[in-house]
Structures are given as structure tokens and as C-alpha cells.
Amino acid sequence: MGKGGNSEDAVSGKEHGEENMAAWLLGIKTLKIQPYILPSLGPYDVKVRIKAVGICGSDVHHFKTMRCANFIVKKPMVIGHECAGIIEEVGSEVKNLVAGDRVALEPGISCNRCSLCRNGQYNLCREMKFFGSPPTNGSLANQVVHPSNLCFKLPDNVSLEEGAMCEPLSVGIHACRRANVGPETNVLIMGSGPIGLVTMLAARAFGAPRIVLVDVDDQRLAIAKDLGADDIIRVSTNIQDLDEEVAKIQSTMVTGVDVSFDCVGFNKTMSTALNATRAGGKVCLVGLAQSEMTVPLTPAAAREVDIVGIFRYRNTWPLCLEFLRSGKIDVKPLITHRFTFSQKDVEEAFETSARGGNAIKVMFNL
């Protein structure tokens, strides 16, 4: 496998006479567009001119705190990982792509040697090098170098912005696969932020007949309803309201909750999911807001409610692109804000995403 876009120590330079620029995270809420030296092109690599980059919640965490979960930014790092672009150059052994192809990039490079990789669980590889996850540089840049097998050609009717949206959509698709969502699966989703919404879109594409979204924010719930939620339920942040809210969820679902997705990851959201899910059902933990939670596991175990988790995704890009090509999923309404790749716009875009509000997906057009 090639090196990919991981020139971790390079901060300045030119690439074939053209300055390659990137958005470097230098400190808390400090981003600066600076030169970025690309690694040399390996035989199985491609050079991609990046055209669309979305801002993810993990990018915002890095921007605001210089860390996300256990990943800590200790030195300047190029930010970003949701991306698509146009092939500019291919390595000597690349056969499936040519210059000019439009591609969506899967951002994680696994080792392909460990037992997890050999078992097909490459997303859990301990040697993973993931765009914009320290210490690996990201994709908010004019150009990146990336392994060709992680670049997926876009169908003619799928835009570069939609290609960049394959990354968050992959989270929803992987979650639905882990939970075995199908045409007879009634789905509850805790949280109507970006990940809750893509999980809803994925569940519908997998055939879920009824989907209910729960949130504390009326504005987000209204967006979920517009995007196709069968019902929406506003809840409080007060744990004392849990039993009443679970009863409301169950009456709204009518036939029972087969699968619950917690796309938030708080004590209350996970407790709600566990209590609302029918006996023999499944709860999938997607959001990881809290590292530790106190939740009612014993009653859930007594009802044989299975609990599964996800970490990122694996083998999802081809299905993402097919759902987008066929129209089974439309991610365009999720893109609420667009910015150019200028110093001013980079700063404003991250502040916009950090504020939340009516911003769902903030997208750069390079």
C-alpha cells in the first residue's frame, strides 16, 4: 500500500512548482492556511486535487479543544477528513483510476497486516492512519496523496459534495449493518444531529418501515421530519422524565422498537434506548459523548436486548455511492452552509459549525 497523505512533519514547500496549501490547526481555535509538502507518489498511490471537504464533529472537537476522545493534537496538523476530488496523477501500478476521474476518499489507512485487518475488521486496526486524526494530517488542502484502493470513482450523477458526504453517511450505513436493519425493522434514533440524520437516511435505504427520532431541540427535529422521519418526539435533559418519555416513544412506535440507535452517547439517551427497545431487540451505540455511563443494563439483559457499538465504518463506500446514484438516499439537503478555501472562510466555517444551531453540514468548495 502507498504512503497516503501523511506528510506529518512537513509544514512548507512546493509541489512541482505549485504551492500546495492546507488548513493547519495550530492551537485552540487557531487555523491558518499554510504550505503543505506532499509525500512522494508511491506506485499504488494517487494524487487528488481536493474539491469538497465537509466539517465533522470530530474536526470541531479538535478545533475547540485540540483533542477528540483519546486523540490529542500535539503539533500542527492539517485538519479535515470528509472529502472528494479529482485525480491529478496516478502511481505506476494504479490500474483502476486515471487522471480526471472524480473520486470520494475513504480517509483511513489500515496496516493490512494485523489480525483485525486480516479478519476484515480493518476499521479497528491499531495502526490506522486517519485523515485529520493526530498525528496524521488531514484533507482540507489543495492536494493530497492517498492509496488508490481508498479512492472510489463517483457515478456521473453524483456531485463532488455528495462524494464528500460518503464519509458521514458511512457511519449510518455501518451502524445499520451492525444492527441488521431491514424491511421489518422499526427504528428509534436518539439524536437528530448530523449523525442521527444520516443514520435515519441509511435506515430508510435499508428498508426500515417506521423511523422515530428523539431530540431536545425543536429545530433539529423539524429538519428530521422534513427529511423523512415518520414521527419526532421532543424530550428533556432531565433523567426524571425518562419513564414518561419511554412510554411516549413506545406508544408512538405502536408495534415496538426493534432497533434503537443512540447517536448522542449520554446517560439519558442510552438509558432511553435500552428501556424503549422491545424484548429481543437491539441497541446500537453510535455517539460517544461520554466515556463512561450509568445505564439500566440488568433490565435490558433480562429482556435479551443486545447491545452493539460501532467505530467509524468498513467497506461502505461502494454502497454509499450506489445509494446516492440510485436516489435511495439524498444527502444534498444536509449541506446547509458553504464556504470557500480562504483564511477568512476557513475561520468562519469552523465557528459556524461549532455554534451548531441550524448548521447541519458545513462544506468547503475548493
UniProtKB/Swiss-Prot annotation:
Entries under PROSITE patterns matching the protein: ADH_ZINC
Binding site for Zn(2+) 1: C56, H81, E167
Functional description taken from the UniProt entry: Involved in the catabolism of ascorbate to tartrate. The enzyme has no activity with NADP(+).
Residues involved in Zn(2+) 2 binding: C111, C114, C117, C125
Gene Ontology MF term list: L-idonate 5-dehydrogenase (NAD+) activity; zinc ion binding
UniProt superkingdom: Eukaryota
Enzyme Commission code: 1.1.1.366
Pathway participation: Carbohydrate acid metabolism; L-idonate degradation
EC primary class: oxidoreductase
PANTHER family tied to this protein: L-IDONATE 5-DEHYDROGENASE, SORBITOL DEHYDROGENASE
Organism expressing this protein natively: Vitis vinifera (Grape)
Keywords: Metal-binding, NAD, Oxidoreductase, Zinc
GO biological process: L-idonate catabolic process
Family to which the UniProt record says this protein belongs: Belongs to the zinc-containing alcohol dehydrogenase family.
Sections of the chain in a coiled coil: none
Cofactor(s) annotated in UniProt: Zn(2+)
Protein name as it appears in the record: L-idonate 5-dehydrogenase
Catalytic activity line of the entry: L-idonate + NAD(+) = 5-dehydro-D-gluconate + NADH + H(+)
